[in-house]
Amino acid sequence: MAFKDLRPQAPVHLLVVPKKHIPTMNDLMPEDNALIGHMLQVAKTLAKQSNIHQKGYRTVFNVNAGAGQSVYHIHMHLLGGRMFSWPPG
């Protein structure tokens, strides 16, 4: 499933969320590899549908509080529509 972030950090800020409950990336098991691969394919499709696939976009998993995770059900952020810098803030 995918939907718009409630507090967008970019013109395009979508969340890709699996149905299976996995609290953090640290809880992934080898059998979840296909699920993560599917999430990346969904992000690629959404980037194209959002017309950000050519200029560039960022995908992010935040893991635990120190990295900014506030919802303990893994989800991938898809951000685009503006320039990003490195390192992130």
Can you annotate each of these PLM segments?
Residues 1-89:
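HIT superfamily nucleotide-processing domains
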